[in-house]
Amino acid sequence: WPILDGVLVTAMTYNGTIPGPMIKVTEGDRVKVVFTNQLEEPTTIHWHGVEVPNAMDGVPGITQAPIQPGETFTYEFVAKPAGTFIYHSHYESDRQVSAGLYGPFIIEPRASQRPEPDVDVTLMLSEWLVRDGVTYPAMPMSGMEPNYFTINGKAYPATETLHVKVGQTVRLRLIGIGQFIHPMHLHGFPFKVMAIDGHPVPETAQQTMDTLSVAPGQRFDIEFTPTEPGQWMFHCHILHHTTNDNVDPGGLMMIIEVTP
């Protein structure tokens, strides 16, 4: 998988992409996911934060047997509650999730009490360790710290540029899927935290911020309205995380291009 021009990682994927395909449903929908394991090792899928029956929780050896290579398993549940969630491997998950087995699972509300934003984008934050062309699981331990950092599977300058207009309401769904905390900082405009871990924040409790720490497994929906045109940076403020193999700039950075 190319995280950057000239930098390939050895990855595991859902349907050939990192992150895996976005699954977007409406609250109350009956969800049926037919999963075939084409890896050379067992795996499962866990529906992180989603209220599912115990047998659908995807924990190997506890709620189901690991899905062996070549086997198919069907996950079925009713989508609830509304919010921003994740699907990811729960088999040797420190290694398989680090290798790319994750994706966004979005449950839209059946009847929203809030106006929908003009722009709605999901950003999954992760890390990689590549040494002498070999990919290792990036972990918070000596000798295993990451040297590449990605947004939706890409490191800056390969990260996607977000194009918006002055006056639009922009929602960013921030998802921490790696093993490190990332304080994400927006240049140019403050934002409000609208939801945490899929649960709406009451209007009276919404905080206005410009930097928000996203921990592993956490999800935040933030919203802002650009007031000035230009190219504005959104990046992790652990500044080593904005490098590619210790070369600045790179990593967890993306441009938000605002036009009049």
Predicted regions and their residues:
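Active/binding-pocket-proximal capping segment
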Residues: 185-204, 239-241, 253-255
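Intrinsic, low-complexity N-terminal interaction/targeting segments
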Residues: 147, 192-212, 233
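Divalent metal-coordination and catalytic microenvironments
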Residues: 33, 45, 89, 105, ...
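Extracellular/periplasmic metallocenter environments
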Residues: 39-42, 52, 58-116, 209-260
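N-terminal, post-signal-peptide metal-ligating segments of extracellular/periplasmic oxidoreductases
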Residues: 1-74, 116-118, 140-171, 211, ...
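Surface-exposed interaction/gating patches
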Residues: 122-132, 138-192, 219-224
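Short loop/turn segments at secondary-structure transitions that flank enzyme active sites
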Residues: 51, 95, 111, 129-131, ...
